[in-house]
Amino acid sequence: MLKKLSYILAAITLVCTMAFAAGCGSKNSDDKQAAPKASFRSIADIKQSGKLIIGVFSDKAPFGYIDKDGNYQGYDVYFAERLAKDLGVKAEYISLEPANRVEYAKTGKVDIVLANFTVTKERAEQVDFALPYMKVALGVVSPKKDNITSIDQLKDKLLIVAKGTTAETYFDKHHPEVKLLKFDQYTDCLLYTSPSPRD
């Protein structure tokens, strides 16, 4: 069961890295090792290459996942295909984890990120966001027999979250008393919650 919490997340958005050019790397000339320069492709570069490189999830249905035939599917992928079509190019996908979305966007490893990416102040200081294309709320999923209806019920329970998500940030900041078990991938979160004697 999905329980909406009072803390509603801003919006899942398209991260637009093509325009992101300032603030990457060290500006201090005394640094012995400067951060490598990020390489961002312009729309003209993308059109000339014939492909738009898009960071998506590969394990978070219905947003981004790989189907039984090995093809990327989901809402974010559908949106990516439309963007590529509008540019007259093919979509090329790079599988991301929640914790590496900012890195891939700000270093130019992908042209854009379409991976269920909520706008936060901290993220907006590092990457540029376009307008939202969906809204979500933070929630908790629990077995029917242990229906969670309030945060107080999470005391002495183990809450599973994906690293680099707003769920992780929210609980770390607002509810440090809740024990978190953090995984890199949503697949691992799901596997750990499969029927077992765990909470």
Kindly label every feature range from the protein language model.
Residues 21-33:
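Bacterial lipoprotein signal-peptidase II cleavage site
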Residues 192-199:
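Conserved small/polar residues in nucleotide/adenosyl-binding loops
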Residues 121-132, 136, 176-177:
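Ligand-binding "clamshell"
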Residues 10-19:
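Bacterial N-terminal signal peptides
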Residues 142-159:
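Flexible hinge/capping segments at coil-to-helix
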Residues 66-68, 80-89, 167-185:
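Ligand-binding cleft/hinge of the Venus flytrap
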Residues 35-116:
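Extracytoplasmic small-molecule ligand-binding "clamshell" domains
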Residues 1-9:
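Bacterial N-terminal signal peptides that target proteins for export
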